[in-house]
Amino acid sequence: MASPRAAVVLASMPDHPDAHGQLSPDTGGTVAVIVVDHGTRRAEANAGFESFVRASADRLPYPIVEPAHMELAEPSIASAFDRCVAAGATTIAIAPYFLGPGNHWDRDIPALAEAAAAGHSGIRWLVAAPLGPDPRLLDLVEIRLAHCLAHVDGRADECSACAGTGRCILR
């Protein structure tokens, strides 16, 4: 079995043949994914994240995909972990919805996952790499900036993130 560090390295290499949701045949089991963000007291922000995770479940090659918030809101990592196990997961990959490695990725999320796993004997888990640094994020930054600048210039509607907020204005 690969170490958690090896699994983190594979998760940071999206073009690696072993990084596409499959465990080796001798490992077996059902893989679940928990996508975790920081969490906020703003209900609409949490709802937007949870909607994103539900939509991503249709694209990800895993039978179980759950949202979780690290703090400040439910579902927590512990409750998402419980739901994954109840749905039949034997391995849980926790995907941080964070741009870079920091204390949350290095310490907080692993500690919360360890506590959640304590009640589930035989369940394996890992915390995957954060989203960046990944050069594909530059494409997203470029697209977002171009759209926002086109909007304030009157050439495009507001993007879905800003729609109705009154925030996408040139001051």
Question: Can you name each region flagged by the protein language model?
Answer:
Residues 1-171:
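Active-site-proximal alpha-helix that buttresses catalytic centers in soluble enzyme cores
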